[in-house]
């Protein structure tokens, strides 16, 4: 699909959390690089920079996600980074500074966004009868969002 879209001059974007990236699998990497050759922009969620904390939050390591960001940057593909801000979970100042350091090391980042956690989809979980994984989470205040934007150096990347 991306190949056809790009052939017609259509801008293509991949919005991903990066979890399936497998840099040690040559077949996967070849297919991924073919996709990237037809991708105008990648929007990547970085939930947590610390591998152990990421594992606690998601059940998965983040090494492949960070490797994906680096690989995309090395390929020269424009990159937007998003960070969902959940008070008490993803707002630790030291880890946000480390995230900013990592982002700064990437060559093609055009934009960094802080996405404030919200409960707009909570009704879907309730309707399906599925326990909501963040029952005690609350949206961040405007001040918390502003502080995260400062720590992540959002203004460096006007996108």
Predicted features and spans:
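A structural motif corresponding to the C-terminal lobe/cap of the Radical SAM core domain
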Residues: 101-104, 110, 126-152
């Amino acid at each position: 699909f991306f190949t056809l879209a790009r052939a017609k001059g259509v801008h293509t974007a991949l919005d991903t959390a990066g979890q399936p990236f497998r840099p040690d699998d040559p077949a996967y990497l070849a297919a991924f690089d073919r996709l990237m050759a037809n991708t105008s922009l990648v929007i990547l969620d970085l939930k947590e920079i610390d591998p152990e904390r990421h594992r606690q939050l998601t059940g998965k390591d983040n090494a492949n996600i960070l490797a994906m960001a680096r690989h995309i940057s090395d390929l020269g593909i424009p990159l937007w980074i998003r960070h969902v801000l959940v008070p008490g979970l993803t707002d630790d100042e030291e880890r946000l500074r480390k995230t900013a350091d990592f982002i700064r090391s990437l060559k093609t980042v055009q934009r960094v966004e802080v996405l404030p956690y919200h409960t707009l989809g909570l009704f879907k979980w309730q309707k399906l009868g599925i326990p909501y994984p963040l029952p005690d989470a609350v949206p961040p205040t405007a001040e918390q969002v502003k502080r995260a934007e400062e720590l992540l150096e959002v203004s460096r990347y006007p996108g």
